[in-house]
Amino acid sequence: MAKREFKAESKRLLDIMINSIYSQKEVFLRELISNASDAIDKIYYKALTDDSLTFNKDDYYIKISADKENRTLTIADTGIGMTKEELEEHLGTIAKSGSLAFKQENELKDGHDIIGQFGVGFYAAFMVADTVTVITKAHGSDEAHQWESAGADGYTIEPAAKESAGTDVILKLKENTDDENYDEYLDVHRLKAIIKTYSDFIRYPIKMDVAVNKPKEGAENEFEEVQEEQTVNSMVPIWRKNKSELKDEDYEAFYKEKHYGFDKPLAHIHTSVDGAVRYHAILFIPENIPFNYYTKEFEKGLELYSNGVLIMEKCPDLLPDHFSFVKGMVDSEDLSLNISREMLQHDRQLKLIAKNISKKIKNELKSLLKNDREKYESFYQSFGRQLKFGVYNDFGAHKDLLKDLLLFYSSKEKKLVTLEEYVSRMPEDQKYIYYASGDSYDRIEKLPQTELVSEKGYEILYFTEDIDEFAIKMLANYQEKEFKSVSSGDLGIENDDEQNQSDGDDSQYKDLFEEMKKTLDGKVKSVRASKRLKTHSVCLAADGEVTIEMEKILNAMPDNQHVKADKVLEINTNHEVFKTLQNAFDNDKDKFKLYTGLLYNQALLIEGLPIEDPVEFTNDICKVMA
């Protein structure tokens, strides 16, 4: 029995197979099970065109057996088997794929899928085994053969005894090292876990002998441990079943089984597409926010299967960031995988799937918003922030997709409203969509800047999250209505009498306002008579794109860039305080400076901005009270 050399550059190539292609050793089992599944598939496909062949699915299965005493692991199948020539051709040549050749020779039509295509998966066995033995008997043949190899040095082929057609792959596991515990691949529970992770949806039964406790025959209340053959994989994935066959409870059970979350899913999406790219997907919108969702540790992504075999536990490219909260899986026959089947080549199919999934998620959320507002608002409390980030990120690339999903608190209804709801009830004379920003609903409601807009009967959106104003700035408008902060210099509210009066005030008190600006020494861009204040004495407004709320948020970030809004101090010239200020301007310059500082600090406090010198501020209050 002469040892034969591999037909490829064996030592170098096999070394790459063992040490470089696969990131995790446990995937060897996935590869060998996939090969076994392919071997059974080949009989099935031949039976489709050969009337002399019959295919009874009950006769075909994969058996995994662990022998702890001899440190061997066997993966056996009842598939098509191999002849001596096929052993030589497929196992004697690294990267020669028998499955790919079978596909090409038989011109399999869409829907008839064999997993293997690279011809390297078998050699993953050498990651965990010193010696690999293959005993095989081809379907319809009377002869069996044994292929054996200890690695790159070569292999042997010799006659063997085997009763039925199929293939047994026997791994003599490596000895344990300080870094690797190869004994784990002899543990039934560990093997079941690997199968559940990667190969749960292989279409044929994967059987194992499992120890179970059963009542001892002839003895009352006594049990004995016996070996029982069990099928350890699910075989038919839920996503390939008709939706009409499934209930909400089935989806919830799948959600829990896959450990997508401890909560119940708020909604699910089950879709099957057979177009430019074929895929099945089950997606879940969770009820509660994951504890680490807004941390660096959170990883977005969907489980990705190719033909029922898990390829990636989290494929980030299938979800945009704004839908990163979605859990679930995708199974496709059309993916371009790399040689290890662990990563994807970034191709057109993947992008198409991701695009379609994004639309499905958006439509589901829109449907939830329309048909179950309470449930949608519950979702929005958890993940609305992420939708707003989606509007803002990537220079607004996704704003049109997301804008109808946004909710904001309203001054009129004191509840969350959509932009469409707001615009639909705008009076004809209202030019803008008005908003106010602050830490909470109650605090915004008390802002002096809201007085004029509220008096006109216009609705105000209350922005209570730091991302709100940035998202709206990126959105710019909705249904051709621009957004306008109640703190903006020009509110676009026409009032001829008030306009004339205000203009007169600015002219009449020009010197006073100039002196106030001088006293504040660059802290404000200007001082002017307010058109918006009714009962309050003073407020801050902002000219330009950066609002006061944006200044607060940007300067609170770790990379504080000391952003400054163009602040304008607005004075209510009809307020009693202004008369006191005017009297001081005419008669007591020191008091005038004192009052100016107090009014400015009062405006800062209203906005939630820090006072530069709290001690000086309290001393000034004492001077006024003394």
Curated annotation (Swiss-Prot):
SMART domains the UniProt entry points to: HATPase_c (SM00387)
Superkingdom in the source lineage: Bacteria
Keywords: ATP-binding, Chaperone, Cytoplasm, Nucleotide-binding, Stress response
Molecular functions per Gene Ontology: ATP binding; ATP hydrolysis activity; ATP-dependent protein folding chaperone; unfolded protein binding
Region (C): 553-626
Pfam families tied to this protein: HATPase_c_3, HSP90
UniProt cross-references to Gene3D superfamilies, sorted A to Z: 3.30.230.80, 3.40.50.11260, Heat shock protein 90, C-terminal domain, Histidine kinase-like ATPase, C-terminal domain
Major localization class: cytoplasm
InterPro entries attached to this UniProt entry: HATPase_C_sf, Heat_shock_protein_90_CS, HSP90_C, Hsp90_fam, Hsp90_N, Ribosomal_Su5_D2-typ_SF
Location(s), subcellular: Cytoplasm
Region (A): 1-341
Region span, B: 342-552
Assigned GO CC terms: cytoplasm
SUPFAM superfamilies: ATPase domain of HSP90 chaperone/DNA topoisomerase II/histidine kinase (SSF55874), HSP90 C-terminal domain (SSF110942), Ribosomal protein S5 domain 2-like (SSF54211)
PROSITE patterns: HSP90
Keyword Acyltransferase attached: no
NCBIfam families membership: PRK05218.1
Role played: Molecular chaperone. Has ATPase activity.
UniProt record similarity statement: Belongs to the heat shock protein 90 family.
Quaternary assembly: Homodimer.
Record-given protein name: Chaperone protein HtpG
Organism: Bacillus licheniformis (strain ATCC 14580 / DSM 13 / JCM 2505 / CCUG 7422 / NBRC 12200 / NCIMB 9375 / NCTC 10341 / NRRL NRS-1264 / Gibson 46)
